[in-house]
């Protein structure tokens, strides 16, 4: 396969002045089906720097937002140092060893010494050429955790517009030709130990939904996709939160499900509280998703003893918290108090629920009952960490480590490691899957990978 290599750097100067059918979109973080893509014979099983790479794009700056896809458009964000010199990245092994020794703290902060430029890119899906790039904001922000980025929120699209949320700046909307349609400013808010932000927006109908939980004033809100005007807003008692909300279309109604340090809260599309429960870990990153008519929620901060997974039935009302010692009730179909993962969201593929722990452990349970199918299995060797969420297609489970190695496993009731695909680059972003291709973001490149 021919590799096309393109650089985005050449356009930075110009920017400063301004299921069965083919799956053609991946419109938000983890797509619409919790990381599961429709089977396609050209979706890749194996790849490497010179194998099955359709194109590779150099991405200036830093950003851990995931790419999204709409037809022939691939969107992603980055933050570029205006000096042209990026802050050196510490060796990945340093972060990994510290993560194993204990959670990182507020001492692990970096503060920019020069203004940064927040950038939205539109990359041509077929060729990898940069269709356009827009500078959204230029400023010198406050400190953040060294391992996070100032562009960690994944954009969202409805096929007509692309929406970008920047936790330090606000909401933006562009049409697919790169014209800015609106901007709704938001003030930066203090996050736990200065770790920065990551919760992404989601689109449903003519509204954009957002959760902004911080140490100051937390809230959930809906915005008009055409104008950016606020439709409703609800103040929340949650502390800092990095989880993306989920639109749950079930057999009873459509809900906006939010998770956080205080618990789970679900609202109707007009912001009215529906149901909730306590019992989450103190820091929450993973995003809810649905499969088999159930809502799956996992929460697993590594320093907490409570690291639960829940499977929720539709139709709940009010407080559905579990009594101490109980694992189910009328609406909690099953739960497990120690199964949750910290950074990666869980995956349900076929009849099985897969938990990928940050330390490279995969655990499989029956998705409908919670019964263990197989216990902890070591995916990786050598202590590498996993931040990106797993994904699945063609009867296989994929998990990409922070080292850029993707581990390919057979889906089903028995664990089998089929192979490893190395890109040899630091990787924290969850890939997108569309048009028979895997779109992978690393610390400095964007890849389109396919066996076409």
Spans of model-derived segments:
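Noncatalytic, solvent-exposed loop/strand surfaces
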Residues: 20-452
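Bacterial N-terminal signal peptides
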Residues: 7-17
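Positively charged n-region of N-terminal signal peptides that target proteins for export
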Residues: 1-6
